[in-house]
Amino acid sequence: NDAVQAEIDAAKAAMLTKPSKFVVFLVMFYAFLCMAIMYGAQQYTKAFGLSVCGLSEMQAAGMTSIYTIGSICAVLFWAFMMAKLKWSPLKVVLIDSVCTAVALAGVLFIHQVAIIYIAIAMLGFFAAGGALQTGLAVVQLFNPGPKGRNTGIYYTFMGAASYLIPVVAAQLTKASGEANAVYSLMIMLLVFAILAILSSLYLVAQHKKIFGKGAL
């Protein structure tokens, strides 16, 4: 316990100024944004491929496999980048958010099988491949405290997303039919990805203020 407390104290001592409540909220809210994108991409890309992009059942099923392969590759890749190149978790979160938005835009606006497959692999890589765990490292950076407490709050935001997305999807389907619903849902995920980019950029600016050095 003393060692844990010493680590927390050292992390707090490294700060030139205390992070605002808004900064602490943002690092936690990333869990909601990331989980919403991840859950939505996992559950609804196949339906999107079938009903919006006109893919065959076989092609749409392939999207799920490509997404999974992308996410497995990413876990290994980011672990290497952060361990070997000492990349800041905030830098990884920013890259993840930008590439997730690009991938979602690709899925939404370019209805060609090859482009959709590339975009889905990118989604798996950048949205699912360890982005949540990296976000938790950002929480510890800006809000040093007992890991159990921070993880608990972070998981609560994740839980809210995995509860909300199916509820929203069900309401949209009821209101406008499946094809319109999955399209609206993908637009919503793109908005979430853009919010994640804006949050990350704000945190990059705050990092300079709080720690006296750039995060990138």
What are these regions (language model features)?
Residues 19-75:
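Extracytoplasmic gate region of multi-pass secondary transporters
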Residues 74-88, 173:
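Helix-to-loop junctions at the C-terminal end of transmembrane segments
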Residues 91-105:
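Structural signature of the two symmetry-related core transmembrane helices
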Residues 141-176:
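A late C-terminal transmembrane helix in Major Facilitator Superfamily
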